[in-house]
């Protein structure tokens, strides 16, 4: 027989047999209908409360035949509710619905929260867009103003360039004029220098002529004096003296004529148009004196510059010595630090240690010695001193503690 756990099918069979039993007059039919009703009620109870493998179930055929059997796992699997019963299924469904409702409510709340956040962000975005629009408007206005300023500046610059070109042309003309004037002055100076040279030459020649004339006059005066002496000595002889006196007078007249001629020559040379006046000569000598003064000033400045250079050489030599000393001290210090870094600290509790190390840096070297004491496993102290091996080096030292945990 086949078990029909469906409540609808069982109810239909029960209704069929009940209606048949009411119409029948046979007691067997009535009993059969009652049995079917009981089995159906039992099955309905199982449909509501559920069943499991091993429990008693009743199979009712279409003709009303009832078969009692123990439920198997296959019967439980074949049941519409998998043996759970309508009550359990409804309970599970109610629980699932409640859970789904809670999940839906939570999701709705989360969605509402997200919507609020999005609304806030949208409002912030709108405000930011408004600020951006305002900033863009301000930027556009500023750019427009800047463009106007650039245009105005360009026009003013163009005008200024034209004015500058005109001024440059005027300056160029002025420079050309000054250049021509300077050239004229240079030519005039060259001519003046030439005339000065010629004047100096003429003055030297006049001076030499004057000296020669003076020498001739002196010689002739001496000759006249000698002749006069001789005339006085010869006064005893009248005729002879008269003749000699006339001769001497003639010579004196000749000497005076020569003197007058020399004076005229000197005057002519002194008044010549090719000779500078005294004022012009004085001006030339003033310029020469100015050049001499400038030369003396330049000599003074040159001497001062030479002294300054000598002072700088002295300072540079001192600075070079200072740098050399600093380089040596630095290398000594690095060598001493290298030696100090090689010292060991004590490792055993309650023990002193004595340690030594050497260190070096380039051409300098140093020796370091130190001692330490470990008080506990966690705490120790040490100290050390280092001295360079070269002369004049200073000592370096360190003191340190160590705590471990």
UniProtKB/Swiss-Prot annotation:
Top-level taxon of origin: Bacteria
InterPro entries: Pilin-like (IPR045584), YadA_C (IPR005594)
Predominant cellular place of this UniProt entry's protein: membrane
Cell compartment(s), UniProt: Cell outer membrane; Cell surface
Summary of the protein's practical applications: Several alleles exist that vary in length, this is allele 3; alleles 1, 2 and 3 generate cross-bactericidal antibodies. About 50% of hypervirulent serogroup B N.meningitidis encode this protein. This is the variant used in the 4CMenB (Bexsero) vaccine. This is the variant used in the 5CVMB vaccine.
Region of interest called Coiled stalk domain, as start-end residue ranges on this chain: 88-350
GO biological process, one term: cell adhesion
Domain notes: The signal peptide, cleaved at the inner membrane, guides the autotransporter protein to the periplasmic space. Insertion of the C-terminal translocator domain in the outer membrane forms a hydrophilic pore for the translocation of the passenger domain to the bacterial cell surface. The N-terminal head domain (24-87) as well as the dimeric coiled-coil region (88-132) are required for binding to human cells. The C-terminal translocator domain (maximally 54 residues) probably targets the protein to the outer membrane. The middle coiled section is responsible for oligomerization.
Family membership: Belongs to the autotransporter-2 (AT-2) (TC 1.B.40) family.
Protein name: Neisseria adhesin A
